């Protein structure tokens, strides 16, 4: 049966419609007619293909570049890991056992703690794989010997061990909160000072020119400038040069170079430097003690016993690595005018090597907070703070009134500040006057410095506690000095930092009945770290390393605090902080090229004109010196294994925040223990 013509037309029409989707069929009002509009396919723009092709080519190149970067990153990580492994092996092989001291005692204690933690971890791992973490066995239902032992352990742990641990945890949390509130109050005080633009204002100002404009030579007080030093051949030139270029009448200033060096070549270099400045007309004297008793305090005390000191009114003190600006005395001495109760004007430190390595960056965070917040707030609101030992000007009458320099502790600067405050003297801190200095670049030097800074205050607190109670100052000042200055900021801070994060936290992983909240482990410390970094905003990328490193340093600070409190022999050791003279050699060459000294009122790196011959001698002395090497710190390594073992236990308990904190804190202890954080000596 043949199809009708309409059916054939319909099939043809459907084929045409499928070929060209742009064909449109219009039905008019008149049903007898159909209008068909056939549109030709749109022509392809050749530029679009070219653009599409170019885009694909660019994407392929971009992905290839990303792949190469990713591959190089993995290669760098692999090489870094291999380097760390080789470095660790080398330092373990070359390690020398520590001497018998308080640090060795602490190491033995931590080593025993590590053995206990490892045994507990093995026990918990066995229990975990047995499935006892789902249904802990009881003594009555236990069948196997191991199960019986574990059941007994659970009962002893819950009944006898966890309660005292929880009590200690609660005490440390309270101390932690008190210290956090103190830190917050200091920051708010600093904000208030900035908001109200509060700062000490001198009653007079010295003109740019020394004499003239209504100022006579007699208007400049007599000032002694002291530079105590000991075997610091890397930095003696820059400190002597900077002090000799102070903008002050030469007839009204005397520079004392107080050299306690035991090395003969260093003595000769310093003596030659002094003679050259004498030839330039500077009133400068060289003093060397044959009997070096009392360390820095004994050195300063001997210098103040000179007969000519009675003719002077003020004394400025600079350590060997400090370079004061030329207008230092013009900005500090005027504050004494008309303020007879003022004993000390302290200025801020600025660091020439703060970006040298990770260790110096982290130190810069701490010291920026110390000067910007602690010293400034205490200076504005209570006129008392700890003297920093350098970059300050003392009224000689105040030094004599409080008994002068004493050799009873390793923090003679804090000692004399406390005694002066108890005698009724006031202090001023100038945050806008800065002196360049160096930060220790090696972990060994920094560790020794921190040990001295934290053992000395405990010695001093033990010695002057009853003097504080018997003093005639107000009860509020006594309370501030005992509870805030000594107990909270010098004793409680290192105690709870070490106990809470290095002892209690890993123990709570093995004693789950004792709870340490997550906000104590992570959130509050994070907020406190942010507050600490505010004075150094460029250091915000280092907030996590800073938090972890501060917990690591709590071991050293805790050991130093215990040593000073209980009169261990190590608390009386004085070790001069090693300097590298980062700013001396380059400036010496610059001077040799220019042929003249540059005087400036801005902070700059300056040195004396001792000549390139002396520089070559200095370089030869450096090469002939003792070979330096990085050390292995066993206490930190042992604590690293404790924290890493606790992180494994927290992983079994599915405690996320605790696990990550313990893991990264343990890795930080490994890095510090292998001495990988500071200067690396190949």
Curated annotation (Swiss-Prot):
Q: Which residues bind substrate?
A: 319, 321
Tissue pattern of expression reads: Mainly expressed in flowers and seeds, and, to a lower extent, in seedlings, roots, leaves and stems.
Q: Which residues form the active site?
A: 260, 413
InterPro entries from the xrefs?
Glyco_trans_2-like (IPR001173), Nucleotide-diphossugar_trans (IPR029044)
Provide any one GO MF term from the record. glycosyltransferase activity
Q: In the Enzyme Commission scheme, what number(s) does this protein have? A: 2.4.1.-
Question: Where found in the cell?
Answer: Golgi apparatus membrane
TM ranges:
109-129, 173-193, 491-511, 516-536, 632-651, 657-677
Q: Which organism is it from?
A: Arabidopsis thaliana (Mouse-ear cress)
How does this protein assemble? Homodimer.
Indicate where the modification Phosphoserine is found in the sequence: 608
Annotated function? Probable beta-1,4-glucan synthase rather involved in the synthesis of the xyloglucan backbone than cellulose. Seems to work simultaneously with xyloglucan 6-xylosyltransferase. Xyloglucan is a noncellulosic polysaccharides of plant cell wall and consists of a glucan backbone substituted by xylose, galactose and fucose.
In which family does this protein belong, per the annotation?
Belongs to the glycosyltransferase 2 family. Plant cellulose synthase-like C subfamily.
Gene3D superfamilies attached here?
Spore Coat Polysaccharide Biosynthesis Protein SpsA, Chain A
The yes or no answer to whether the keyword Cell wall biogenesis/degradation is present is yes
- Give, as one word, the top-level EC class: transferase
| Record carries keyword Transferase | yes
Q: Which GO terms describe its cellular component?
A: endosome; Golgi apparatus; Golgi membrane; Golgi trans cisterna; trans-Golgi network
Tell me the protein's name.
Probable xyloglucan glycosyltransferase 6
């Amino acid at each position: 049966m043949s199809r009708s013509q309409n059916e054939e037309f319909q099939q043809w029409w459907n084929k045409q419609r499928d070929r060209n989707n742009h064909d449109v069929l219009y039905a008019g009002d008149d049903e007898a007619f159909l209008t068909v509009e056939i549109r030709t396919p749109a022509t392809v723009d050749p530029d679009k293909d070219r653009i599409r092709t170019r885009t694909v080519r660019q994407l392929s190149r971009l992905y290839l570049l990303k792949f190469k970067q990713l591959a190089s990153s993995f290669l760098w990580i692999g090489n870094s890991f291999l380097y760390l492994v080789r470095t660790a092996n080398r330092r373990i092989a070359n390690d020398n056992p520590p001497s018998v001291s308080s640090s060795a005692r602490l190491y033995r204690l931590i080593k025993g703690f590590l053995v206990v933690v490892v045994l507990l971890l093995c026990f918990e791992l066995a229990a975990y794989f047995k499935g006892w973490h789902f249904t802990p066995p009881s003594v009555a239902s236990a069948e196997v010997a191991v199960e019986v032992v574990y059941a007994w352990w659970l009962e002893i742990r819950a009944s006898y061990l966890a309660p005292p641990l929880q009590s200690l945890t609660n005490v440390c949390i309270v101390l932690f909160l008190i210290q956090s509130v103190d830190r917050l109050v200091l920051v708010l005080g600093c904000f208030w000072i900035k908001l109200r633009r509060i700062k000490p204002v001198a009653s007079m100002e010295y003109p740019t020119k020394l004499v003239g404009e209504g100022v006579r030579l007699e208007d400049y007080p007599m000032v002694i400038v002291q530079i105590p030093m000991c075997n610091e051949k890397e930095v003696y030139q820059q400190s002597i040069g900077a002090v000799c270029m102070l903008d002050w009448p030469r007839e009204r200033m005397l520079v004392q170079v107080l050299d306690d060096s035991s090395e003969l070549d260093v003595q000769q270099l310093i003596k030659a430097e002094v003679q050259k400045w004498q030839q330039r007309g500077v009133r400068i004297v060289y003093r060397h003690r044959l009997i070096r008793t009392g360390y820095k305090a004994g050195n300063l005390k001997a210098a103040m016993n000179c007969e000519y000191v009675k003719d002077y009114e003020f004394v400025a003190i600079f350590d060997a690595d400090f370079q004061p600006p030329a207008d230092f005395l013009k900005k500090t001495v005027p504050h004494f005018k008309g303020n007879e109760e003022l004993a000390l004007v302290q200025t801020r430190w600025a660091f020439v090597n703060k970006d040298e390595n990770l260790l110096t960056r982290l130190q810069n965070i701490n010291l920026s907070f110390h000067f910007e917040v602690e010293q400034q707030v205490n200076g504005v609101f209570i006129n008392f703070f700890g003297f920093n030992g350098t970059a300050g000007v003392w009224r000689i009458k105040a030094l004599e009134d409080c008994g002068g320099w004493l050799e009873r502790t390793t923090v003679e600067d804090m000692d004399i500040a406390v005694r002066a405050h108890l005698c009724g003297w006031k202090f001023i801190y100038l945050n806008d006057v800065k002196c360049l200095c160096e930060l220790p670049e090696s972990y060994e030097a920094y560790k020794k410095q921190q040990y001295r800074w934290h053992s000395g205050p405990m010695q001093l607190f033990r010695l002057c506690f009853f003097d504080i109670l018997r003093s005639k100052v107000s009860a509020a000042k006594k309370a501030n000095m005992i509870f805030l200055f000594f107990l909270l900021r010098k004793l409680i801070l290192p105690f709870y930092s070490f106990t809470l994060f290095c002892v209690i936290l890993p123990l709570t992983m093995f004693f789950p009945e004792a709870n340490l909240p997550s906000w104590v482990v992570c959130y509050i410390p994070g907020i406190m770290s942010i507050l600490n970094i505010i004075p150094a905003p460029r250091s915000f990328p280092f907030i996590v390393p800073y938090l972890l490193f501060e917990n690591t340093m709590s071991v050293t600070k805790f050991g130093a605090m215990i040593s000073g409190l209980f009169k261990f022999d190590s608390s009386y050791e004085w070790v001069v902080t090693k300097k590298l003279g980062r700013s001396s050699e380059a400036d010496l060459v610059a001077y040799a090229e220019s042929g003249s000294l540059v005087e400036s009122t801005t902070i700059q790196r300056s040195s004396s004109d001792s000549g390139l011959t002396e520089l070559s001698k200095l370089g030869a002395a450096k090469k002939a010196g003792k070979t330096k090497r990085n050390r292995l710190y066993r206490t930190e390594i042992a604590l690293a294994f404790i924290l890493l073992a606790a992180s494994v236990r927290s992983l079994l308990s599915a405690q996320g925040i605790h696990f990550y904190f313990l893991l990264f804190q343990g890795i930080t202890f490994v890095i510090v223990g292998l001495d990988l954080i500071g200067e690396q000596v190949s």
